[in-house]
Amino acid sequence: MLTITEIKSYISEAITQYQSVYVGADIVPVTVCPASRRRAVRNRVINECGLDYKEDAYGTDAEVIFGPNGKQILIYQSMMKTKQQVLHALWHEFGHHLSGDEKQYGINLERDTPMRSGYAVFNEFVAEYIAYTVNDAEPFRNAMGSHIYLQMAFHEERTINPYWLSRYFAIVLGDSAVSEDDFAFGQSLVSPAVWNYINQILNVLISQIKKPDFWIADAEFLETLGCLFDEMFHLVFMGA
């Protein structure tokens, strides 16, 4: 585990590298959450952002706290083992800040709609993809990483985890270590029908990241992405 001092020393480097790619992008305050005072520091930041409560996803390495009084990024000392891990975690959270949240798209997360499904995939995809565009030397990465993410996305029977599916697409499109052959191997891990949807979703994401401001989605894109995900989910639920 890195020390608080070590983590803080890497924050300015993360900001410099990020803003060299995303010129003019603003940065929100970053707070290092000590392992020994995780709950207290996290609660303080939540209150400063104007929230009374935000569910704590133990095991996450960093997160954006977004409330009526502003945004802050929390990075957790207990999860930080290397400099590159700190950098990548911060770039990922900077990506979340850059791309915004569901409110700007008018999405009600309590309603099951294609827009919500599309946002669920795009939200994590774009943050992770942005991190790769800054520097794709992600810790622990290798060409097999995409296969692991794909397997995790479909690990539970008759369901799909959109978080791991988003990470899968981000590593396929953003990690230079993943070749076309590596991607093609994925078809051996899922059914032909599911693989067809994987390719359709990939093509939709490729079209999006070709845009100069790819991190800003529109309703048509999210609807298309969400419909594809929902159709694939139905196939998996039915046992495909």
Locations of the language-model features?
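Post-HEXXH active-site segment of zinc metalloproteases
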Residues: 84, 99-127
